């Protein structure tokens, strides 16, 4: 069975098709990236760390579902830190953890496939979620975000769901629920529910004007940016 290095990060979930730049400065994870480069290991598993958790106890401090990511690029800095870019693939279960031989953790590859159902039902569910997302964007994003959303929106339904989940402003624990959803339809419906709740809770006086405002996200593409344990700055889908 294949093994992947495990990278626990606070405030960070990775969905299929999502790209994520990471700054690696902690010694054990610098070693992890060096080993990946030396051994031509192009995949790592990223999992959400629980709030205020002791990362040294990885089984208690992380969620049981994470994501396998491909390392797209690695850039080493003169001080030995790294900038890397990863791309979300399939989700996985965090099972047996191994740290006997390395300063970082590794896990066995245990895929956790997302259930797929009737394509027509999935398509209709995606349309509904996208309509709600457009409403959500009008309330919470800058005035020109809708155009950028339409330009960046993927065609594949799985990636459309990832695009929505990565862009809505929700706590990491709720985003984790989206990642763990049993099926694509469940993921889309729960994302729609979260967006609808936030739209309905929004005060009318807080609605953005027709002009750009510093209080709103500048573009849809950075709406889910977050800073994680290694100063990770989350970007969205290609």
Regions found by a protein language model. Name each.
Residues 1-238:
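N-terminal low-complexity, acidic/polar interaction/targeting segments
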């Amino acid at each position: 069975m294949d093994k992947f290095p495990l990278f626990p990060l606070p405030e960070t979930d990775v969905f299929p098709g999502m790209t994520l730049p990471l700054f690696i400065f902690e010694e054990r994870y610098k070693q992890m990236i060096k080993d990946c480069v030396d051994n031509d290991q192009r995949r790592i598993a990223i999992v959400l760390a629980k709030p205020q958790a002791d990362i040294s106890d990885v089984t208690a401090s992380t969620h049981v579902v994470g994501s396998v990511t491909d390392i797209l690029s690695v850039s080493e800095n003169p001080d030995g830190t790294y900038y890397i870019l990863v791309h979300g693939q399939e989700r996985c279960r965090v099972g047996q953890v191994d740290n006997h031989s390395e300063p970082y953790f590794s896990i066995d590859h245990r895929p956790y496939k997302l259930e797929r159902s009737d394509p027509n039902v999935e398509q209709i569910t995606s349309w509904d979620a996208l309509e709600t997302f457009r409403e959500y964007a009008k309330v919470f994003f800058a005035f020109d975000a809708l155009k950028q959303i339409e330009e960046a929106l993927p065609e594949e339904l799985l990636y459309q769901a990832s695009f929505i989940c990565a862009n809505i402003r929700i706590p990491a624990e709720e985003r984790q629920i989206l990642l763990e959803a049993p099926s694509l339809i469940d993921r889309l419906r729960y994302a729609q529910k979260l967006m609808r709740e936030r739209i309905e809770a929004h005060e009318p006086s807080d609605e953005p004007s027709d002009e750009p405002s510093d209080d709103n996200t500048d573009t849809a593409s950075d709406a889910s940016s977050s800073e994680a344990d290694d100063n990770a700055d989350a970007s969205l889908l290609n």
